[in-house]
Design a protein with these regions (language model features):
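Membrane-embedded alpha-helical segments and adjacent helix-loop junctions characteristic
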Residues: 47-147, 326-420
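Long, contiguous bundles of hydrophobic transmembrane helices that form the permeation core
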Residues: 191, 206-299, 311, 315-334, ...
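Inter-helical loop and helix-membrane interface segments of multi-pass membrane transporters/permeases
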Residues: 2-6, 44-62, 167-199, 211, ...
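C-terminal transmembrane helix pair
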Residues: 84, 158-161, 179-180, 344-356, ...
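Hydrophobic transmembrane alpha-helices that form the pore/transport pathway of multi-pass ion
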Residues: 97-186, 190, 396-439, 449-463, ...
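Hydrophobic transmembrane alpha-helices of multi-pass solute/ion transporters
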Residues: 2-78, 91-99, 270-351, 365-376, ...
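Transmembrane alpha-helical segments and their short flanking loops
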Residues: 47-57, 163-202, 210, 290-291, ...
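Hydrophobic core segments of alpha-helical transmembrane domains in multi-pass membrane transport
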Residues: 14-24, 35-42, 72-81, 113-117, ...
């Protein structure tokens, strides 16, 4: 008997309770804990507190992967702290200030930087968020807007680049083949992954949506309110907001009055070099003699490489700061520890998010939701059903990887069966699993990547979730329409994707005009490219 058969519809209570409480109370850790506790009550049929604590401890002690991620997060915090105290982030800002003299240019630079940093979503949010925050503040871009740009060019970009995401996706495809019993009859996993890219429409449209929002400078929903507040009154955070971190408060003043680029380039260069070298080394070692590039990528230990790289960033920051005479060893170590401390809130939420993921696994939440979705599947509806089943599971559990693990072994056999034991529907099944998982991840306040986006941009976490949700929902609706058209007509997605981009642009224009008129605000929040530093009203 599976967890879904045992607990049924009540299995969705813990994640939904946590999500609703987080949105209403804006207290993510408390809300997550109460959601976990409700799961303990359901699971045990009693007060459930012992089960709740056991689940929480197991999230820390029984998963090597989770331990590595927590260590990476702490090292990234320490590395960012060293870069900030040594003036590296300020030096980047100073070097770019003469060129990035408008909010649009800062937004475009952040967008491009995020797309170039394609090999990891965690390091993407850490480096891009920290580097661009001061420039965004100077141009009066709201922290909510910066968090949105960072978040939507982290995981979506990582799904297409040389990253741990792609390796994980390939492993999920193999699991789907095994579940369907078609390993010798279907395309190679990497080939299917490439075929699925045009159907990963949420990620493609999410990246494009960021560009449309930045270039047109049009906003709607709660983001319009945030941008209007920031631009008109200089408040990059709303009154009473609780930002996830503040480098100034946590780390103190910079150790120099003359920031130099080397204090950014050396630690970050070390991170990049070690991550790429470590990935190549582990990939070659595991792939055997004379491996092809695909084999190297498929066998690379990207998480391990990121662990080594984040450590090297801390070490290089310490060495360059001490040898450069900006601080002694004791002060450097205190800075690193301050950086660790700065990540405690994010680490706490990550542990709670992983724990509620354990709860949903034990109660069978994902399997229950997927089984319900299966009852309405037809060839035409298959892409949209998989998309929204994945979205609901990811939103409820806060983990896109966990969602892929739950849905892919079900979606691939379904697509094979509905497609008449032919591979026709496999690419769309794989692409829509990934799309739905990342959409749910973007909208969930218990998602690790969403949490880290708030952390490294210094935004209020729930404010980030609430403002981003309007844009994510817009993107998923456009993706749904395009997938429905594909299901009905089988027109190539290479034709549908440009149409979807045009529809996105039209929606952004129309919604921004309507919302601004409704709120009696300028659709562009009174921003003008001629003003590099707006005056207060």
């Amino acid at each position: 008997m599976t967890g879904a058969e045992t607990f049924g519809a009540i299995s969705v209570v813990p994640p939904l309770l946590a999500i609703v409480l987080a949105i209403v109370t804006r207290r993510a850790i408390l809300s997550l804990f109460l959601g976990i506790w409700s799961g303990g009550i359901i699971f045990t049929g009693s007060i459930g507190i012992i089960q709740t604590l056991n689940w929480t401890v197991s999230s820390l002690g029984e998963s090597l992967f989770n331990a590595k991620i927590l260590t990476i997060v702490m090292f990234l915090g320490g590395g960012v702290a060293m870069i900030w105290r040594l003036g590296g982030a300020k030096a980047i800002g100073n070097a770019a200030t003469s060129r990035l003299d408008s909010q649009r240019k800062v937004g475009l630079a952040t967008w491009i930087f995020g797309m170039l940093w394609f090999f990891g979503d965690y390091s993407n949010t850490a480096i891009v968020g920290t580097t661009m925050r001061d420039m965004a503040d100077e141009m009066r871009m709201s922290r909510e807007k910066l968090s949105y740009i960072i978040d939507s060019t982290a995981a979506p970009v990582a799904t297409f680049g040389i990253s741990s995401w792609v390796v994980y996706q390939l492993s999920m495809i193999e699991q789907g083949y095994e579940a369907a019993g078609i390993s010798g009859q279907a395309p190679e996993a990497f080939s299917l992954f490439l075929q699925s890219i045009p159907f990963n429409m949420y990620c493609l449209f999410a990246i494009v949506m960021v560009g449309i929002i930045i270039i047109t400078q049009r906003d709607f929903g709660e983001m319009l309110d945030a941008e209007h507040r920031s631009w008109k009154h200089g408040k990059v955070l709303r009154d009473n907001a609780v930002p996830m971190q503040s480098a100034e408060d946590s780390l103190g003043e910079m150790a120099t009055d003359s920031p130099q680029l080397r204090y950014f380039l050396l630690p970050v260069g070390s991170l990049i070099t070690v991550v790429f070298a470590g990935s190549a080394y582990t990939g070659i070692a595991a792939a055997g003699e004379n491996p092809a590039l695909i084999d190297i990528v498929g066998n690379a230990a990207f998480v391990d490489a990121l662990l080594w790289g984040s450590f090297s960033m801390v070490a290089m920051g310490l060495i360059s700061g001490v040898t450069g005479g900006l601080m002694d060893l004791e002060e450097a170590m205190e800075t690193i520890i301050d950086g660790f401390s700065m990540m405690i809130t994010a680490a706490s939420i990550l542990v709670m998010a992983w724990t509620i993921g354990t709860v949903t696994t034990e109660l069978g939440t994902g399997i229950y939701v997927t089984n319900v979705a299966e009852t309405i599947i037809s060839p035409m509806l298959l892409p949209v059903v998989i998309l929204f089943a994945s979205a609901v599971i990811a939103f409820s559990t806060g983990t896109s990887w966990g969602t892929m693990a739950i849905v892919t072994p079900i979606a691939i056999p379904l697509a094979w069966s509905i497609g008449g034991s032919a591979p026709t529907l496999l690419p769309v099944a794989v692409g829509t699993v990934f799309s739905g998982a990342i959409f749910g991840d973007h909208c969930s306040p218990i998602s690790d990547t969403t949490i880290l986006s708030s952390t490294f941009t210094g935004a209020d976490h729930i404010d980030h979730v609430r403002t981003q949700m309007y844009y994510a929902v817009t993107v998923i609706l456009v993706a749904s329409v395009m997938l429905l058209v594909w299901g009905a007509t089988r027109i190539t997605p290479l034709v549908l994707l440009p149409i979807g981009v045009g529809l996105l642009y039209g929606l952004v224009y129309g919604l921004s005009e309507w919302d601004a008129s409704r709120k009696n605000l300028a659709p562009q929040a009174a921003r003008t490219e001629q003003q590099s530093s707006p005056s207060d009203d």
